[in-house]
Amino acid sequence: NSAKISYGELHQFTYLLNEPLLNKEGEVLQNTQTVHTQSYIFRNDGKEPATNVELIFNYAPMYLNVWPSRLFAEKSDSSRRYVMVFDYLAPKETIRCEVLAINTQIPMLLSVRCKEGVAQNMVLMPQKVFHPAFINSL
């Protein structure tokens, strides 16, 4: 009976924008732009709190959103990797992390761990939701 962190990638997408990238003088640098998004979910599936939950990215994301809104510390390790540290994740608590980058790649999520252990990666797939009446008739 301890903390058990799991995480997975909910989705990712690349938008191709038909908007030119301009320099300060208004000259076109690129005819189109790209916006990359990636969404992760983190969950404590255990029966005890997870403490010092660390999300380690290859480098700091251009834009980052955490939902529900949570306070976290930002650090970098000796290799200048970007580390987000959440002090606490309650049993059955879930947080999402959305990353966005414009005209550049999104940093890779390298590691997820907490004081109680290393997180387990879970593969997520879209699933059709059936009406309860249909399920109960089986």
Description of each model-found segment:
Residues 2-22, 91, 98-138:
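Terminal connector regions
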Residues 15-35:
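Short, solvent-exposed beta-strand/turn "edge" segments of beta-rich domains on protein surfaces
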Residues 27, 36, 40-49, 54-59:
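Asparagine-centered strand-capping/turn motif at beta-strand->loop junctions
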Residues 31-33, 46, 88:
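Sterically constrained small-residue positions within well-ordered secondary structures
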Residues 33-37, 50-52, 79, 94-96:
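A general secondary-structure signal for short beta-strands and their flanking turns/coil
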Residues 40, 55-57, 84, 97-99, ...:
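Preference for bulky hydrophobic residues occupying beta-strand positions
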Residues 50-75, 114-115:
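Short acidic, flexible loop segments centered on an aromatic residue
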Residues 69-105:
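Intrinsically disordered, low-complexity Pro/Gly/Ser/Thr-rich segments with frequent PxxP/GP/PP motifs
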